[in-house]
Amino acid sequence: MNIEKTDYINSLLDIYAELLTPYQQEIMDLYYQEDLSLKEIADEKEISRNAVFTLINRVEKILINYENKLHLLEKRKRIQDELDNEINLDKLKEKIELILDE
């Protein structure tokens, strides 16, 4: 599994997991947090490996769609960049307000 993709999906899960069903959350947690294989998840849930694969791909697309519409991860990263780079608190407050108003 690609580490960059894993980090990206984990970041999306941090933000949007509550918008998923409990079952979707559980499968994604087993795959991305617990690092179980598709087969291990399939065995544990008594479903086919293909069903796990399909569900994970579907949820990944859902998460990416949420981000494309809401941009919460992008805003979080931009705010963190401003926090890392800005010393003047008044300027920082203005920049964060601009980001959140978008």
Q: How does the language model describe each region?
A:
Residues 55-58:
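Residues within the DNA-recognition helix of helix-turn-helix
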Residues 71-92:
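Intrinsically disordered, low-complexity basic tails/linkers immediately adjacent to helix-turn-helix/homeobox/MYB/SANT
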Residues 4-16:
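Short, Lys/Arg-enriched N-terminal segment that forms or immediately precedes the first helix
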Residues 22-34:
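Short amphipathic alpha helix immediately N-terminal
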Residues 37-38, 45:
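Helix-turn-helix DNA-binding elements, focusing on the entry/boundary residues of the two helices
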Residues 60-67:
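C-terminal flanking helix
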Residues 41-42, 52:
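Hydrophobic positions on the alpha-helical face of helix-turn-helix-like DNA-binding modules
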Residues 48-49:
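Helix-turn-helix DNA-binding motif, specifically the short coil turn and the N-cap/start of the second
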